[in-house]
């Protein structure tokens, strides 16, 4: 299989809008590893009505955060199926208790931290507007409507999702920072934190790629389909 004999245990961290999803999918495309998104895992369990999915849904329905022990159970249960693979966790651990619980089960080798200035993220996230009737999405920077605030086809007004409003974005970013700073510090002290800073995903990616080349076998061209 190449690289080292020991399998890689890694996690990726980054604020909402940091490009974490894009970087994760590129990592999965280029390297031999399993990508485990805690958000996808949660949705899948809720959809299938598993015991832990039902439990998690009760918190979500009440507008509460899912407790650390529930998220930890969810992820550790899934990781049992991935013991023979290199893996990359995405969206977990999000808090210090989650990181400590993960540590008791697995030795984490690398934590990739995408450090994108909050101002850049705020611009990215608040640039999105939608046409409620059709679900058409516009981005003020990349594909703006012909007339500001108006849907191209119907002439109806565009709206901004609650999540994309500047005040909501700022609140989410501050909450992320408060929650994850202790986690980053925890991994920094362990000497496994690798921070990649920048304002554009396409400029950050080559550095992440070069770093992972030293840690992981690459997919051969014939098998480079996403697992």
Curated annotation (Swiss-Prot):
* Family matches, as InterPro entries: Adenyl_kin_sub, Adenylat/UMP-CMP_kin, Adenylat_kinase_CS, Adenylate_kinase_lid-dom, ADK_active_lid_dom_sf, AK3/Ak4_mitochondrial, P-loop_NTPase
Residues that, per the record, bind GTP: 17, 19-22, 128, 138-139, 161, 172, 201
Q: Name one GO biological process term.
A: ADP biosynthetic process
GO MF terms here are: adenylate kinase activity; ATP binding; GTP binding; nucleoside triphosphate adenylate kinase activity
Give its E.C. classification number: 2.7.4.10
Q: What is the annotated role of this protein in its UniProt record?
A: Mitochondrial adenylate kinase with a specific GTP:AMP phosphotransferase activity. Could also use ITP as phosphate donor. Its physiological function is to recycle GTP into GDP which is necessary for the TCA cycle in the mitochondrial matrix.
Q: Can you say what this protein is called?
A: GTP:AMP phosphotransferase AK3, mitochondrial
Q: Write the gene name.
A: AK3
